[in-house]
């Protein structure tokens, strides 16, 4: 009698659907997945250890590079941990700015997820549509920090600087006519808040376009409905958070349950799924795009009416303004010491978490009283989600494994750390 053996397939890390550097060792029976073994570590950069060798303020930039699609949300968890140990509270205007940019970041993340997932499954048009909107939001990042991705904008005690009164303008070149430049600059004549307000007025129509292409699309539903079903009980046991947990029907959102920044001052709804499949997770993220847009509009309205400080007035934690520094020797000394030695935190330990686009992103920090952390532990939401991949994918076809992996929204910067 012929002995039949299962086929072993290496999926990634070079595969375009591997979401970075994921290597999957799949055991197949025909085209049905019997077992999946994720191999991680190919993007390990020792971020936790690096942060333990530098003053607190110098590690903010490392946070951007963990989940490099949810930059400011990662920064938020880190600076909140420092603020808890210091016992300081940022000004209310800084809280609103953080809330607004957290939601800008959420839209950036979900747009990339939607475009990449559609591309993995075979719908290319959505990818181009999503990147059209992402460019406008990257312009907002650039306006406040000078960088389009790794902003390093949040600071212990607030944010680096107030919102700008002008937006960067496109300049004439030999590749673009004056008419094209004028069209590109028509909504950049005012402040950042004006530019963002214009975006929030256009964006719901853009989301409608995505849904027209996908939500009732027969092929899209065949590829996502009843694929990768996770029950509420299993979702909790695996440690799911964010859209993965809400897609299984559990309305858990740190912005509501353990409110931080200005989330207790804005109104929004928590979308939840019913069956816990890939389609439900898609619907949850699409509705989160609309809710984030709603939160941003509320923040803009408040920020327009309430000018004020954006960081604490304590030179031990927050650098003095450049104008003051150039006229006051003491302020210059504070500035020099802050960016060379940094500041020391009281002895203690703290856990700080935010509702990042992928789930609960947490920072566990232990201080021994020095100017750098004794221990820094990063809780990445994608790590728990990827752990469940074998359980989610068993019994599905090989092509469905791509859809399930895409629905988890995996980014290896935070998983490997």
From Swiss-Prot:
Gene Ontology cellular component annotations, sorted alphabetically: plasma membrane
Residues making up the signal peptide according to the UniProt record: none
InterPro entries with a match to the protein in the record: NADH_Q_OxRdtase_suD, NADH_UbQ_OxRdtase_49kDa_CS, NDH1_su_D/H, NiFe-Hase_large
Record field: catalytic activity: a quinone + NADH + 5 H(+)(in) = a quinol + NAD(+) + 4 H(+)(out)
Claim: Protease is one of the keywords in the record: no
Repressor is among the record's keywords: no
Domain of life: Bacteria
GO molecular function, one term: quinone binding
Topology with respect to the bilayer: Peripheral membrane protein
Compartmental location: Cell inner membrane
EC number: 7.1.1.-
Record keywords, A-Z: Cell inner membrane, Cell membrane, Membrane, NAD, Quinone, Translocase, Transport, Ubiquinone
Enzyme type, top EC level: translocase
PROSITE patterns: COMPLEX1_49K (PS00535)
UniProt family annotation: Belongs to the complex I 49 kDa subunit family.
Function of the molecule: NDH-1 shuttles electrons from NADH, via FMN and iron-sulfur (Fe-S) centers, to quinones in the respiratory chain. The immediate electron acceptor for the enzyme in this species is believed to be ubiquinone. Couples the redox reaction to proton translocation (for every two electrons transferred, four hydrogen ions are translocated across the cytoplasmic membrane), and thus conserves the redox energy in a proton gradient.
Xref: NCBIfam families: NuoD (TIGR01962), PRK06075.1 (NF004739)
Subunit structure: NDH-1 is composed of 14 different subunits. Subunits NuoB, C, D, E, F, and G constitute the peripheral sector of the complex.
Protein known as: NADH-quinone oxidoreductase subunit D
UniProt source species: Legionella pneumophila subsp. pneumophila (strain Philadelphia 1 / ATCC 33152 / DSM 7513)
């Amino acid at each position: 009698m012929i002995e039949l053996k299962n086929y072993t397939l290496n999926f990634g890390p070079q595969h375009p659907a591997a979401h970075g550097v994921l290597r999957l060792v799949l055991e197949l029976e025909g085209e049905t997945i019997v077992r999946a073994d994720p191999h991680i570590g190919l993007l390990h950069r020792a971020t936790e250890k690096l942060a333990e060798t530098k003053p607190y303020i110098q590690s903010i930039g490392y946070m951007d590079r963990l989940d490099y699609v949810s930059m400011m949300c990662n920064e938020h968890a880190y600076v909140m941990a420092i603020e808890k140990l210091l016992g300081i509270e940022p000004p209310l205007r800084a809280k609103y700015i953080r809330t607004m940019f957290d939601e800008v970041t959420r839209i950036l993340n979900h747009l990339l997820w939607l475009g990449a997932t559609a591309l993995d499954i075979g719908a290319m048009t959505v990818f181009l549509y999503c990147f059209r909107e992402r460019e406008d939001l990257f312009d907002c990042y650039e306006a406040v920090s000078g960088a389009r991705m790794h902003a390093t904008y949040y600071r212990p005690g607030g944010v680096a600087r107030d919102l700008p009164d002008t937006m960067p303008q496109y300049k004439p070149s030999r590749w673009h006519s004056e008419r094209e430049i004028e069209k590109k600059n028509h909504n950049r004549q005012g402040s950042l808040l004006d530019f963002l307000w214009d975006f929030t007025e256009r964006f719901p129509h853009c989301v409608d376009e995505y849904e027209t292409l996908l939500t009732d699309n027969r092929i899209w539903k065949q590829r996502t409905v009843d694929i990768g079903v996770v029950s509420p009980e299993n979702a909790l046991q695996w440690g799911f958070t964010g859209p993965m947990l809400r897609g299984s029907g559990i309305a858990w959102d740190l912005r509501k349950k353990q409110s931080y920044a200005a989330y207790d001052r804005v109104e929004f709804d928590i979308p939840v799924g019913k069956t816990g499949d890939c389609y439900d997770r898609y619907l949850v993220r699409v509705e989160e795009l609309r809710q984030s847009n709603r939160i941003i509009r509320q923040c803009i309205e408040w920020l327009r009416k309430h000018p004020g400080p954006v960081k604490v007035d304590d030179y031990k934690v927050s650098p003095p303004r450049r104008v003051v520094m150039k006229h006051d020797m003491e302020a210059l000394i504070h500035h020099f010491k802050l960016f060379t030695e940094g500041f020391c935190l009281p002895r203690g330990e703290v856990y700080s978490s935010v509702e990042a686009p992928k789930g609960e992103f947490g920072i566990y920090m232990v201080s021994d009283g020095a100017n750098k952390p004794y221990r820094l532990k990063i809780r990445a939401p994608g790590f728990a989600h990827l752990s469940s991949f074998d359980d989610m994918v068993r019994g599905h076809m090989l092509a469905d494994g791509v859809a399930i992996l895409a629905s988890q929204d995996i980014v290896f910067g935070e998983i490997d750390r």
